[in-house]
Structures are given as C-alpha cells and as structure tokens.
Amino acid sequence: RLSPEVRARVQCAFREKVFRPIHRCLETNKPFWWFTVTNNWNSVCLAGVTGAALALLPDREERAYFVAAAEKYHVYGMKGYADDGYCSEGVGYYNYGFRAYILLREEVCRATQGKVDFFRTPKFVRIAQYGKKIQMLNGICPAYSDCRIGLTVDWFINNYCDNVLGTAPYFEKCVFPSNGRNLSLYSIEFFPNQAWKLEQSDEIKQAIQEEYDPLHTFYEKAGILVARPSEKSNCDLAISAKGGNNAENHNHNDIGSYAVSLGRETVAGDQGGPFSYPGDYFSADAPDKYPIKGSFGHPVPLVDGLQQVTGARAQAIVLNRELTRTKDLFSIDLTSAYNTPKLEKLLRTFTYDRTDVGSFTVEDKFFANAPIRFETALTTSADWKQIDANHLLLAVGNEQMLVTIDASGEVELTSDTIQVNGPAYTRIGIILKKTVKDGQIRLIMCPKRP
C-alpha cells in the first residue's frame, strides 16, 4: 500500500496537472483542442481524464462535473466514424481509439449505474460491427491509412461488443495484455463478464438485425468494399477496395487503393503506415517526402508523372456497384484526384470473382485531350519475379499469385524499394511505353496452385 504521504502527493499532482487545467479551460469556454477533435485523441484523452477523476476525486459533485464533460464532448470523437460505422483512421486506430471509447463508456456507466450510456445510438452498433465487417479472411484486414501491415481487430473489442449487444455466441474471455501495452487502456481485459449490457431499444434492435452478408461488406459513406469467398469453396482469395477522398483522418492520398489476401497472407496491395512516425510525417509536404504516405507508395496510377492531390476535392465517385453470389464489381471515377488539365477521365474498375480458385482484376481506363504518360503500380512485400513481358509471379509463405498485365500498348516495368520506419516493400511500376491520349491497363491476379 502507498503511504499517506505518497497518496497526498499524487492527489496534489493530479489536481495541479490535470483537474484544475481541465476545469479552467472548460469554465472559460476554451476547451483543449482534443475535446472537439474528431479522431482517436478525443476518446483516449477523455477516457484518461474521466477515469482519473472518478478514481481520485472524493467529492461527488466534482466527479459529476467530469462525467458531464465526457457526456458533452464524447460525441466529437464519434464524428470521426462514418454513420455506417466505417473508421477512416484504419484498423490500428480503431483498436486504440474505440478501445478507449469502450473504457470511457464503462467508466461512466458504472459511475451512473447505467443512467448515462454513450452506446445508446444505432451508430454505435454499426461502429461495433466494423471489427468483423472489415476483415477479409482469416482475420486479415486491409492496411488502409496509418494501419500497420498485418494488424487485425483486437479480439477483446469484438468480444466486448458482442456481449454488450447480446449477440455473443460465447462468454467473455479474460485476456492478459502483452508486455509493453498501456495498462490504463488494457487492464479492462483482466475482468471478463463485466461488460455493462446495452438497453435494447427498438432502434438498437433494428440496427443489430441489419443484414450482414458474409460474402461482402460495402461501406457506402466511405466507398469501401470487402469481398470474401464462399464458405467451403476452393477459393481462399479475398480483397478490399477503397474509394473515399483524400481529406480523411490519416489519409494517404490513395483513393483507388486495394488489398489482396490469399489464405493467411497479404499478397499485394496497400502496405499500410509506418510503425513509428517521422517528426514531420503530418506536415503538408509529407506525401511527397514519404512514399508510404503519398500515391507513389500505393497501388494507384500516376498521371503524367503526377501523384494524387491532397484534400476533399480528390473524391472517388462511385459509378457502379454490383454485388452477387459469384462476382462483385466496383467502379469509381478518379479524375478529380489528379491536377492536370490534360486528363479528361480516369476510371478504375475492380472485379472480384469468387468462383473456382478466384480472381481479382483491377482495370484503369483513361481519356486525355493531349498525349500523356500513364503508369499504374503493384505494391507488395512478397518475393516476386517477372516471368515474361506480361506476367509476374508473387510468392509469400506457402502462397503464390500470378499477375497478368493486359494493356492497350507495350509496357515497361520499374522496381522501387520503399521503407519508412517499417517493413520494406516493393513498388512495381507498370508504364505504357508510349504517351497516348487514351488507353487502359488491366491487372488480373489469380492464385497459382501446384
């Protein structure tokens, strides 16, 4: 046990460094920036401050003040999620930010005996289901935004949400956090069977019952497709493709990006974000300085040597979406992402075929008013080799994938190694040799079986 002297010093430090500054900024209507930011900072900071206040402040009125602040400002963090539940920050920040939101919710529910519950909205149900819907196959998730390659959704989050919603086919599980993790966020895992159950209003029940299709997930607000093979089929190829815009949280200027998994391996596509951030990673010129943050490090086109522009005006327009039991098609217009008057139209179409062993096709068609240089790219951490002028072979683990290049003219290939505070990967540039006013490049990816 801590001595009374140490406890007094801790109480004093928290008052001077945490509680009084928070009280002062709120009373002067100048809340710290994280109170109204629409990303993970809001939930993480509110969970820490609210939990500290509930644990350390002896006065009930003081504790109520901090609960009221959480009740007022937690909505800003929720604005960072689309209404359909999509997390534009990526799976890594979903694990971090939504876990903090879960902790905040538990703190407030327990302090108010469930009278104040931040989960009483249909949007929460959709955010809670993101952890399952974003998975392609075998727990593999697309590494969009600043998600680290190889991350999956924390088991605890899915387990907790299932128990809160009453949809769990299993009991809560006690999971001991791995070494080095933030104990304040992860200690909740020590106490299974403690999730505060959600009051089942008609709106909540309706949101829970919204159809979940195991073959595909489409986030209409964000323009994100996840397509999976049929159960017990010969296909173990799964994909995701993204539209969206280049003003999203932790965005990489990469509308039109995609991810391809085969078995238990990510074979090609988006390689995610760095494992630690360079000091100027969030500066305006970072997409040009760090390939992993810009178009060059992603499986998207370069138009006349230009990368995609930053900002909401770079918006993927969904032209067509056809999701069936055998094949999924997703077509988007990428024209606004490239700042060149020569380009009149750039269309990208994704086609996922789940029959037999499966296939995935990415097709770019462009139209210009003057000859342009057009290039697309394949990004991968797999071992690869060029078989002939129009075929590549990718190999990772026990999996192999054949890539066929079908273009309107002859192509040349380039190879660049990209590494920014994380695992190295290869960018294979696929370039039309001649400048032309219109053309197409189609990449057809198929598993290669022995």
Predicted feature residues:
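Extended glycan-interaction surfaces of carbohydrate-active proteins
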Residues: 1-30, 55-80, 157-175, 180-196, ...
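Catalytic Cys-His active-site segments of thiol-dependent hydrolases/isopeptidases
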Residues: 268-273
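Aromatic-lined, polymer-binding surfaces characteristic
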Residues: 1-135, 140, 147-148
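Short acidic-hydrophobic surface loop/beta-edge motif
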Residues: 51, 225-230, 258-260, 385-387, ...
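Short alpha-helical segments and helix-capping/turn motifs at coil-helix boundaries
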Residues: 35-36, 243-245, 286
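Residues embedded in well-ordered secondary-structure elements
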Residues: 38, 216, 247-249, 253, ...
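Carbohydrate-active enzyme catalytic cores, enriched for enzymes
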Residues: 56, 96-267, 323-324, 435-436
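CBM-like, beta-strand-rich accessory domains located in the C-terminal region of large
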Residues: 175-182, 274-450
